[in-house]
Regions:
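Active-site rim elements
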Residues: 52-56, 195-201, 343-356
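The feature captures the conserved acid-bearing segment of alpha/beta-hydrolase catalytic domains
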Residues: 256-325
């Protein structure tokens, strides 16, 4: 009997592994951009010679960054789209046996054309910062959609804070200073986490402002000459990148608004608030908008409430039901085997759904603050997404705890 049982287990396991192998090899196309423009993509490596990198293991190292730029493009018909994560960037794939349950990056297809000509027009700047440990290319779906709506989207990978970045064709991994263990603590606003966040935030904010300045300078000559609207700069981020986006907007005079995607807030902006428009988008029962229940992060809820109360600019807050923290990245679009989905704590909305919803709200927010176009989606006059709960809009009272 035992032998027969073991044989059944072995056959079932082999069958499941075969199923996973087949699924991970099937093509995955990222969500189709919804704007009127085609999308181009190019990759820069920029060094801020004015800053010594405090996160680098070697002393006296200038701060260098990989910046992926997605932009409104005008490629020739039939041009081949860019590979999703070329060369050494493929190292972002989950390693070890667990990676066998993730779509191979060679079958993930974005929509941008590499180094395409720039479309006619002048376009606002959006600086995108990833979550801690993540790299900007892992937000390709959001970036491509924004670019298709007429934005220059500069994705900044924070060197030594990302698990992997690529500079000069060589991989650079995280350092202890760049990816502090204090963030592994359940209390993200405890003394150790606050100290680590303060140190890291200053670096990430400087990264975002440096990238915005370098992108603005591209308006003077070269491919992007005459295409950069440097008078309209917005900052966007996920997780810790969201905290950095808000603080960068507070510090940057040219900022016209900032969006935080499911990121616990830190820094002076929590105490002083933001005078510019602000968008906060939360996963289900996340505390980043100040509205959460149960055993959720009480200190994070308090920080978000202080931020909203102190802000004099317009504030929009939304919760996406069925979404979890990692769904704001391209992981929402990959095939992931069920055990891996559980390990990564992804949501229940189905592949690509959360990304589609987030893109729609980002598009609406940015169109309103950079172009003055009224957005029924933001006010709730238009409610196409059943997953979304409106928590706060300009002129409304902050939502009470549920």
């Amino acid at each position: 009997m035992l032998g027969a049982f073991l044989a059944v287990v072995v056959l079932a396991t082999a069958g499941y592994l075969g199923y996973v192998a087949a699924r991970r090899s099937q093509p995955v196309t990222l969500p189709t951009p919804t704007g009127p423009y085609q999308v181009g993509r190019t990759i820069f490596e920029w060094t801020d010679t004015a800053r010594t990198d405090p996160l680098a293991p070697q002393p006296d190292t200038a701060r260098s960054l990989s910046v992926w730029l997605w932009y409104p493009g005008a490629p020739e018909p039939g041009e081949t789209t860019a590979p999703y994560l070329p060369g050494a960037w493929s190292g972002l794939h989950i390693g070890g046996p667990a990676g066998l349950g993730e779509s191979g990056f060679g079958v993930v297809h974005p929509h941008a054309v590499p180094d395409a000509p720039v479309a006619d027009g002048r376009f606002p700047i959006v600086v995108l910062e990833p979550g801690s440990g993540f790299a900007a290319p892992q937000y390709t779906a959001l970036a491509e959609d924004l670019a298709s709506h007429g934005y220059l989207v500069a994705g900044v990978t924070p060197t030594y804070s990302a698990n992997l970045t690529v500079l000069h064709d060589r991989t650079v991994t995280a350092s202890k200073a760049g990816l502090p263990s204090a963030f592994d603590n359940s209390d993200l606003h405890g003394p150790a986490a606050e100290q680590a966040a303060a140190r890291l935030l200053s670096v990430w904010v400087a990264d975002a402002r440096f990238a915005a300045a370098r992108l603005a300078a591209l308006d003077a000559s070269g491919r992007f000459a005459g295409h950069v609207n440097a008078s309209a700069i917005a900052f966007l981020g996920h997780s810790f990148g969201g905290a950095a986006a808000l603080e960068a907007c507070r510090a940057e005079a040219a900022c016209v608004g900032a969006a935080d995607l499911d990121g616990t807030q830190y820094g002076e902006v929590v105490r002083a608030g933001l005078t510019k428009p602000m968008l906060l988008v939360a996963s289900e029962n996340s505390c980043v908008t100040g509205d959460c229940t149960g055993s959720a992060d009480a200190s994070g809820r308090a920080a978000a409430r202080r931020l909203v109360a102190a802000s004099t600019g317009p504030v929009w807050c939304y919760e996406i039901g069925g979404a979890r923290h990692i769904d704001f990245s391209d992981y929402d679009a990959y095939y992931l085997a069920a055990p891996l989905r559980k390990l990564l704590a992804l949501g229940t909305n189905g592949r690509g759904v959360t990304l589609t919803v987030v893109s729609a709200y980002l598009d609406a927010f940015l169109d309103q603050i950079t172009r003055g176009t009224p957005q029924p989606l933001l006010t709730g006059e238009s409610r196409p997404y059943r997953e979304v709960r409106i928590q706060h809009t300009p002129g409304s009272e902050t939502s009470p705890p549920r």
